[in-house]
């Protein structure tokens, strides 16, 4: 419903851009409308939620529009889902999407030094792991220090033991390691963090 309310005159940008080899490795870019994008615009890579089992980037145009309307370049990426892959797979996909975003930020009119990751619900977990656990960016020659910060919207950051059957599959429960949890990596040297949750959100 929200996507039908999006004001399409506030953004432009390429859609269906490939960032990796899998059919799910696609992203859309939302650049602020109204002239040339300044070369120092902040860039936000957004990961949607859906219990790691569902979701499509086309369902989140309202996120891209909201960011673009405020002068922010938004990138909304699809990633592989469970049961096709376990958590290692979708985190590797998110790392690839971030690599693409960092490499293309300047050509989109953004500042490569002002790139952030943001996610909602399950997507907030993905964003947190890229920002806190260096294992996912290391194979790409990147570190979390490349991020200007990360934003988590109603995300799960410490959810062992796992009780949801779908999430159990995604994380290989009961053999889920403790270092699969973002809280395991919380430290004072992490990128700047903004965590948001609704007042009446039940955890």
Q: What are these model-derived regions, one by one?
A:
Residues 1-38:
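N-terminal cap/lid segment of alpha/beta-hydrolase-fold proteins
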Residues 6, 22, 155-185, 191:
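Mobile cap/lid helix-loop segments that gate and shape the active-site cleft of serine hydrolases
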Residues 39-50:
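Short beta-strand element of the alpha/beta-hydrolase
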Residues 44-46, 74, 193:
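Hydrophobic beta-strand anchors of alpha/beta hydrolase catalytic cores
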Residues 58-76:
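Short amphipathic alpha-helix adjacent to the substrate-entry channel of hydrolases
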Residues 96-165:
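Primarily recognizes the serine-hydrolase "nucleophile elbow" in alpha/beta-hydrolase
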Residues 144-148, 188-193:
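Short, proline-enriched alpha-helix->beta-strand connector loops that line the catalytic pocket
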Residues 194-197, 201:
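Short beta-strand/loop motif that positions the catalytic acidic residue
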């Amino acid at each position: 419903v929200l996507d039908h309310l999006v004001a399409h005159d506030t953004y432009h940008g390429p859609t269906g851009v490939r960032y990796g080899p899998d059919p799910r490795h696609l992203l859309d870019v939302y650049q602020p409308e109204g002239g040339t994008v300044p070369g120092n615009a902040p860039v936000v890579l957004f990961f949607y939620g859906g219990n790691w089992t569902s979701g499509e980037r086309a369902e989140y145009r309202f996120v891209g529009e909201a960011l673009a309307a405020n002068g922010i370049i938004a990138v909304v990426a699809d990633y592989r889902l469970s049961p096709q892959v376990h958590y290692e797979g979708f985190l590797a996909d998110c790392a690839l999407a971030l690599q693409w975003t960092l490499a293309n930020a300047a050509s989109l009119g953004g500042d490569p030094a002002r790139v952030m990751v943001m996610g909602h619900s399950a997507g907030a977990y993905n964003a947190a792991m890229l920002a806190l656990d260096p294992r996912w960016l290391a194979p790409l020659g990147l570190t979390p220090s490349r991020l200007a910060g990360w934003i988590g919207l109603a995300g799960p950051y410490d959810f062992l033991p796992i009780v949801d059957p779908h999430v159990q599959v995604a994380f290989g429960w009961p053999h889920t390691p403790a270092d699969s949890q973002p809280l395991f990596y919380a430290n004072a040297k992490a990128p700047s963090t903004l965590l948001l949750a609704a007042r009446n959100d039940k955890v």
